[in-house]
Amino acid sequence: TDATEDELALTAWARILLEGTPIAMDGSWQLHRRRAAPEPVRFAKRFGGEQSNTSIMVGDAIIIKMFRRLEPGDNLDITVHNALNDAGISSVATLYGFMSGQIPAEEHIPVDLAMIIERLPQPRDGWELITAKAVDLVDVTDLVAGLGQCLRTIHEALRHTFSTVEIDGSRVADDMVRRLDAAVVTAPALARYRATLTARFEKLRGRHLAAQRIHGDFHLGQTLLTPGGWRIIDFLSLIHI
């Protein structure tokens, strides 16, 4: 039986993580608390939906996300949530803590095992929401404007939190023209815009451009609308742009 199917054991474990003083006797893992839990642990159970990780629902306000695929080093989702929380950004979930350990077979390389994060209240999937309104021909201008402002605030915080880099404008121009040509092959209707777009890309040549980290996989499926506004999730990758 998978240990995460035992709700009594899960509840006891969650209480140790969030309320007690957990100690790994063999030193194989550590708990890092970042912020106080919003409520006492009443119950814990495994989320039954299809997910890339194992999610444990702790009461109504917390999720423990256990990573199925372990990667050496810091988990980016943990790092970004912690940084944005510290910056006072309210459009991401609150990180309450995380668990880390070591991989003995890999010369004790550190690895993050799980994150303890806010369970967002009454979330509505952004993709399902916007597409449903599109089918009904409902104006979504205010909704998407709010989402855009939310993303802008996050990216501004990422610019201040993480270092910026300088990139070669000529290389960017080459890459954009190459992508445009590939897009024209796939969608010939774009051909009439090629000259105008290429002219814009050419203006980048010879310039040094400041680039910052942004959400590396942003789409409506990474957004949730809650009573408190838009929330953006899953910072599993960041790219410079």
Describe the predicted segments one by one.
Residues 1-176, 228-229, 238:
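Conserved ATP-binding subdomain of kinase catalytic cores across diverse folds
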Residues 217:
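Conserved catalytic-loop position in the HRD/HxD motif
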